[in-house]
Amino acid sequence: MLSINNVLNRRSFLAGAAALGGTAALAGCSSGGSEGGSADDGKTFKIGVIGPLTGAAATYGVSAEKGAKLAAKDFSTKDLKLSLKSEDDVADGEKAINAFNTLCDWGMQALVGPVTTGAAVAVSGEIADDMLMVTPSASSLDVTKDKTTVFQVCFTDPTMGASAAKYADAKIALFYNSGDTYSSGVADAFAEQAKESKLDIVDTETFKDDSSTSFTNQLTKAKEAGATLIFAPIYYTPASVLLKNAKDMGYDMTLMGTDGMDGLLSVEGFDTSLAEGVLLMTPFSADDEKNADFVKAYKDVYDETPNQFAADAYDCVHAIAEAIDKADIDITADGADIAGDLAKAMRKIKIDGLTGELTWNDEGQVEKPATAYVIQDGKYISA
């Protein structure tokens, strides 16, 4: 079995940083940059990466791409060279399908992504069991429904919603992006669990991407309803806006988010003191000692702290490498010819990942412990 700690410890971080940094420089800002060896050497396995590398959601896709690149370096061996090629989907389903087709033309044998839920649902519907797809952060049950070669690394919407409800014991305002599959899916699951648990949801507010520059109106209604906790399964950029708006209007409440909010402390221009006391359901913490080697390696290469999106994508590549080893496939074969064997291997492997101990069920959903953190003094503390 491939171990993260063994892999990270076997390499020179400085040498790895120089090698990866040099390649990234050659690729520049192009969305078609690749990592790895020559495809005709009999040792190269091609992994495509799809996510938003430009546009409003680019920060999530770029983080995932960086994590995947680092993993490709770490899990390549003398007999297995993991080659990566990234394509930009701008968090759009149609563009994600176009990106998938482009990667197929390149010779992709397995896919990491898409990063966002809507795009992942679109691509998984096109795969027809002809490609191993491991998405780092798409959480809807629709991603893997009726698919045999599609897998998730992040928690599913019901898991996140139900787990979050266990931590909520106040007057709650539910706040989510009604135009986003991830956000609305987790919100629905939370509301269902809240009803079963007899939690007190006093207000429900929504927004869409084109109205995410101010949430004063929604917060005013939540405050008037007496909400002391806002459960918001949203990404970290709108979360930073919400917290600033709340401070400006003097609304003292607790914000609770899910894994998409990880990265809040790194939002450019954000006053991180506003995040004090924020409760997060996320499988990864850069402050956790067990992730120290990965965090150091990531910082050495990218000069920034990794977030959950980077860690999830790293675990995707780790899982694919483990599945290749388990399946004992011909790594020069077409993706369609080996997808079934890789999928069978995915359901048998167990990896000690950055985001927990990961296994997968028959539906392709990840099974790992749900964890919660509270932000205190700019660090993640176990809740």
Give the label of every model feature segment.
Residues 1-8, 16-27:
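N-terminal secretory signal peptides
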Residues 27-40:
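Bacterial lipoprotein signal-peptidase II cleavage site
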Residues 38, 60-66, 74-144, 153, ...:
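Beta-alpha junction/loop-to-helix N-cap segments that form part of ligand/metal-binding clefts
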Residues 48-67, 87-94, 116, 177-184, ...:
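Extracytoplasmic "Venus flytrap"
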Residues 243-314:
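Extracellular/periplasmic periplasmic-binding protein-like sensory domains
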Residues 306-310, 321-379:
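Segments of small-molecule ligand-sensing domains
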